[in-house]
């Protein structure tokens, strides 16, 4: 690793966890500037306790959050604190040997997610932005008012890239980027409608309750049967879709018994 630099597409532990440990003496570690504030270190503004407070305000039971604190691998396997990360801005260029990659900002999965694209060869390192066998998790992020809206715009952004070789971070490495981006956008359009219809049928629910009534692709008979970590992901996904609807005036949020409750406004959920 003495002559190797590291580019982190985003902050999640399965992408960043070992970077500070395997670096060489002169290794540079790059990450999107908007993800940098969430990385463990002196620059971090993220605290798991704050996340728990926000989820509790959305109806997630405190006792289940306490169990998650002990079981959640994202908490137990966070990268070691490191203060040498170098921030990446959209359009930054990385020249190594004969290759010249451009950083493409693709927020949504995380606020600072970055893809690397080389115009000459059409090589594109997608990170977790577009996956071909599974759908990237889109959740609410501190400091981002509309993660899902950001993600949908990012899908449009990569659809315009001329690509020849795709390198996603998980599962299948082959696929049609434009077609898959359109499939992911259609998936979220259906989930937006599902969230809005759920609230319309039963107004005044918390995000935790709304998630329990939404349709999910998981082999469980009921919300009660969901594994706890999957409940956490589902509520985060529900929140991203609720934020999308609220920003566009389709949903309103109010305080109810110390928690946030949601009501649907009239109109088409996809407007």
Walk through the language-model features, giving the residues of each.
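Active-site HxH/HxHxD metal-binding segment of metal-dependent hydrolases
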Residues: 1-95
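Histidine-centered divalent metal-coordination motifs
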Residues: 9-15, 32, 109, 113, ...
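Aromatic/hydrophobic pocket-lining residues that form the small-molecule binding cavity
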Residues: 16, 151, 238
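Metallo-beta-lactamase
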Residues: 74-83, 100-192
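Short, acidic/polar N-cap/turn motifs at the starts of alpha helices
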Residues: 90-93, 113, 250
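Residue-level signal for inorganic ion chemistry
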Residues: 170, 195, 245
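C-terminal regulatory/interaction regions
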Residues: 198-271
């Amino acid at each position: 690793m003495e002559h190797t630099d590291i580019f982190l597409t985003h902050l999640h532990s399965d992408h960043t966890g070992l970077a500070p440990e395997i670096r060489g003496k002169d290794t540079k570690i790059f990450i999107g500037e908007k993800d940098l504030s969430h990385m463990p270190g002196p620059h971090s503004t993220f605290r798991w306790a704050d996340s728990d407070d926000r989820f509790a305000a959305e109806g997630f039971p405190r006792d289940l959050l306490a169990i998650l604190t002990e079981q959640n691998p994202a908490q137990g396997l966070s990268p070691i604190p490191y203060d040498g990360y170098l921030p990446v801005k959209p359009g930054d260029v990385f020249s190594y040997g004969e290759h010249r990659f451009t950083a493409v900002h693709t927020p949504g999965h995380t606020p600072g997610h970055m893809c690397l694209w080389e115009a000459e060869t059409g090589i594109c390192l997608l990170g977790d932005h577009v996956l071909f066998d599974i759908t990237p998790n889109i959740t609410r992020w501190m400091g981002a008012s509309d993660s899902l809206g950001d993600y949908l715009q990012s899908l449009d952004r990569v659809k315009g890239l001329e690509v020849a070789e795709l390198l996603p971070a998980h599962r299948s490495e082959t696929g049609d980027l434009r077609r898959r981006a359109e499939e992911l956008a259609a998936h979220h359009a259906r989930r937006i409608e599902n969230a809005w219809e759920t609230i319309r049928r039963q107004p005044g629910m918390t995000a935790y309750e709304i998630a329990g009534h939404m349709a999910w692709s998981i082999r469980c008979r009921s919300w009660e049967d969901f594994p706890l970590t999957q409940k956490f992901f589902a509520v985060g996904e529900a929140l991203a879709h609720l934020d999308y609807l609220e920003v566009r005036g389709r949903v309103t949020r109010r305080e109810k018994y110390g928690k946030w409750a949601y009501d649907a406004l009239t109109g088409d959920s996809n407007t």
